[in-house]
Design a protein with these regions (language model features):
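An acidic, charge-biased composition feature
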Residues: 1-290
């Protein structure tokens, strides 16, 4: 496994999208995945399964960076960086705040890859989670293929992915368990928003028309048969294999993380995910009542 970080001069999903598309165009393979991150400044983290030439990977990443980021582009300074990431750093990981540290200048940097074994069920599942992430990245790239990716494109792609995940999860573990997963995701993001000073009673409004539209989509897909989901968003490979053998609470944690990483790749991770899980919870429970 090799890794490289492409640091950008400013925050914004559009610039990240462009660099990701360019790297995908120059990298000669599909055995890689990416995440967006903020610590040390806005950047894209590239991980390749191939453990070959690290110098070549750096060169390709620099090629993507140089093609997209203009020379002399104004960059964040330390104060602007700290202001931009304050809420994220305060919310932290697992309720523990993160020190945002110093801003790193825009450019390409080699980086070690440290797998988050515990988050995804242990070292035994490492090969499986790698396949899930490369598959997720390939799906996300389809949504990011446009020069102008709107918020609606991002959220529609996120909704299709999570509905497919829920469909597979319900088939494997039962509908009641899938409803519990949707509610666990909504509750998790409510806690995260509260940590970001949104207020302990904060609620993200979800319109009734949006709920009705999503519920209608689910009904139409069910009526069309199991192949319909494959047309819209191919099922995340190996996810159910990864989850077998864990109790429901652990399965929920692993799957919420997998969904979050997919949304991150789409550029709609974080705050929008509360609305997404609220919507999916609504849809799942509406279907249960019918």
């Amino acid at each position: 496994m090799r890794a490289v970080h492409i640091h950008l001069p400013n925050f914004g999903p559009e610039l990240e999208d462009a660099v990701i598309r360019e790297f995908a165009a120059v990298y000669p393979g599909h055995d890689w995945f990416f995440v967006r991150y903020w610590l040390g400044g806005p950047h894209v983290r590239i991980r390749t399964v191939d453990s070959g030439d690290a110098v070549e990977l750096l060169a390709l990443a620099r090629q993507a960076f140089d093609s997209i980021v203009p020379q002399g582009n104004p960059e964040l300074d330390q104060d602007a960086y700290l202001d931009a990431v304050r809420d994220l750093a305060t919310a932290g990981e697992g309720g523990i705040a993160i020190d945002p540290g110093d801003l790193r200048p825009a450019g390409v940097y080699p980086a070690p890859y440290v797998p988050e074994y515990e988050r995804y069920g242990g070292a035994a599942g490492f090969d499986t989670i790698t396949r899930v992430f490369t598959h997720s990245s390939a799906i996300a790239l389809r949504a990011l293929a446009h020069d102008a990716v709107t918020p609606n494109i991002r959220m529609n792609a996120a909704l299709l992915y999570v509905l497919r995940v829920m469909s597979d999860y319900a088939r494997e573990f039962g509908r009641e368990e899938a409803c519990a997963l949707a509610e666990a995701g909504r509750a998790f993001w409510h806690r995260q928003l509260s940590g970001e000073r949104a207020g302990s009673g904060a609620r993200v409004p979800v319109s009734e028309s949006a709920v009705a539209k999503a519920a209608g989509l689910v009904r139409d897909l069910r009526a069309a048969g199991p192949g319909a989901f494959d047309v819209l968003a191919p099922g995340p490979a190996d996810i159910t294999e990864l989850l077998r053998g864990w109790n429901p609470q652990r399965r929920h944690g692993i799957l919420i993380s997998i969904i979050h990483m997919h949304n991150n790749r789409l550029g709609c991770g974080g705050r929008p995910e509360y609305a997404l899980f609220h919507l999916v919870s609504h849809v799942m429970n509406t279907g249960r009542e019918q």
